[in-house]
């Protein structure tokens, strides 16, 4: 077992390198779709830490997490662990992006990592450089400017009503300005690139002929209430829903294909609403571990809450489709 491991960014990756001291009792949390990434097994071999599946076993307490492994493409999960100052490894080459991008820094986050990018580091290399702060602290207490007497009439401080109103308005304007700046930043860095990606993906599928192939397969399912219920059960199946949910990409692609078929008259228009519920039956299933972590839920809550939500979506998916079908029958007839 190594004393310190060094993790460098992979090809086209960002951040790092991370130097992690191996401390007994820590755990490796991985929240990834599909099978366990190979780097998790490599980290277990180097550190001797226990690997914990965040989807199935829930997240351990923050003080027990030695490193977090994710597969985020630029959404909220990228910054979830860096915000809590937990070393984060992203197997995707995702940089500083997402709603929590301000917390993603090179000293706590590294992306595009492969097995070859993780190695044992010498203690001398891993030791962080000591910064001489004594002189800085001493110099910080010495002001170079002049001290002015604020007891004079012209310069004395006022805490009257007008001053309080001015300070309150200034604070409100600052908050609104910051919120607007963060909103624009999120739109430019997260929402617009994602919209462009989905649009390009749909265009490729439609132009390549793959869309027609998928549409022919979906038409029998989307052409009747029973077929839509079957589609909802497939999308919300607990073993599939966490992998179908990220970014709602699959739901958007299928929605476009179904919409084209409705426009062509292949699928009756009154089935549009139940079809919408059917293809979104898996909504939020991929976000449950992240949401519970943001809420600082206990480990027992995460362990019980994740499967409960997955099974709950599976149970409620079909009834919502039937309710939508009943409602749409009154709308279009």
UniProtKB/Swiss-Prot annotation:
InterPro entries: PTS_EIIBC_GUT_C, PTS_EIIBC_GUT_N, PTS_sorb_EIIBC. Keywords: Cell inner membrane, Cell membrane, Kinase, Membrane, Phosphoprotein, Phosphotransferase system, Sugar transport, Transferase, Transmembrane, Transmembrane helix, Transport, Virulence. GO terms for cellular component: plasma membrane. Its EC number is 2.7.1.198. The modification Phosphocysteine is found at residue 72. GO terms for biological process: phosphoenolpyruvate-dependent sugar phosphotransferase system. It catalyses: D-sorbitol(out) + N(pros)-phospho-L-histidyl-[protein] = D-sorbitol 6-phosphate(in) + L-histidyl-[protein]. It is an enzyme of class 2 (transferase). It is found in: Cell inner membrane. It is a multi-pass membrane protein. PROSITE patterns: PTS_EIIB_TYPE_5. GO terms for molecular function: kinase activity; protein-N(PI)-phosphohistidine-sugar phosphotransferase activity; protein-phosphocysteine-sugar phosphotransferase activity. It comes from the Bacteria. Induction: Activated by sorbitol and repressed by glucose. Pfam families: EIIBC-GUT_C, EIIBC-GUT_N. The chain crosses the membrane at residues 191-211, 220-240, 243-263, 271-291, 304-324. Residues 1-192 form the PTS EIIB type-5 domain. The active site is at 72 (phosphocysteine intermediate). The EIIB domain is phosphorylated by phospho-EIIA on a cysteinyl or histidyl residue, depending on the transported sugar. Then, it transfers the phosphoryl group to the sugar substrate concomitantly with the sugar uptake processed by the EIIC domain. The phosphoenolpyruvate-dependent sugar phosphotransferase system (sugar PTS), a major carbohydrate active transport system, catalyzes the phosphorylation of incoming sugar substrates concomitantly with their translocation across the cell membrane. The enzyme II complex composed of SrlA, SrlB and SrlE is involved in glucitol/sorbitol transport. This is PTS system glucitol/sorbitol-specific EIIB component. It comes from Erwinia amylovora.
């Amino acid at each position: 077992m190594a004393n310190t491991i060094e993790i460098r960014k992979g090809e086209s990756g960002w951040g790092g390198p991370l130097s992690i001291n191996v401390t007994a009792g820590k755990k490796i949390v991985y929240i990834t779709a599909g099978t366990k990434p190979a780097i998790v097994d490599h980290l277990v071999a180097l550190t001797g830490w226990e690997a914990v599946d965040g989807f199935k076993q829930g997240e351990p307490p923050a003080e027990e997490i030695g490193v977090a492994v994710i597969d985020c493409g630029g959404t909220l999960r990228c910054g979830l662990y860096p915000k809590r100052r937990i070393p984060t490894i992203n197997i995707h080459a995702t940089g500083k992006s997402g709603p929590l991008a301000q917390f993603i820094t090179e000293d706590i986050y590294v992306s595009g990592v492969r097995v070859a990018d993780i190695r044992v580091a010498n203690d001398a290399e891993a030791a962080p450089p000591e910064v001489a702060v004594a002189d800085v602290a001493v110099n910080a207490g010495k002001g170079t400017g002049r001290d002015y007497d604020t007891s004079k009439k012209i310069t004395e401080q006022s805490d009257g009503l007008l001053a309080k109103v001015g300070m309150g308005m200034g604070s409100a304007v600052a908050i609104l300005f910051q919120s607007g700046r963060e909103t624009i930043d999120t739109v430019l860095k997260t929402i617009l690139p994602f919209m462009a990606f989905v649009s390009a993906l749909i265009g490729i599928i439609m132009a390549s002929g793959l869309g027609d192939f998928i549409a022919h397969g979906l038409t029998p399912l989307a052409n009747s209430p029973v077929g839509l219920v079957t589609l909802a059960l497939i999308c919300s199946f607990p073993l599939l829903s966490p992998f179908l949910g990220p970014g709602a990409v699959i739901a958007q692609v299928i929605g476009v294909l179904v919409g084209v078929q409705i426009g062509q008259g292949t699928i009756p228009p009154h089935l549009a609403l139940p079809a919408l519920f059917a293809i979104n039956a898996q909504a939020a299933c991929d976000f449950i571990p992240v949401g519970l972590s943001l809420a600082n839920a206990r480990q027992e809550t995460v362990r019980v809450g994740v499967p409960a939500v997955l099974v709950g979506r599976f149970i409620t998916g079909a009834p919502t489709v039937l309710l939508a079908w009943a409602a749409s029958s009154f709308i279009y007839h």
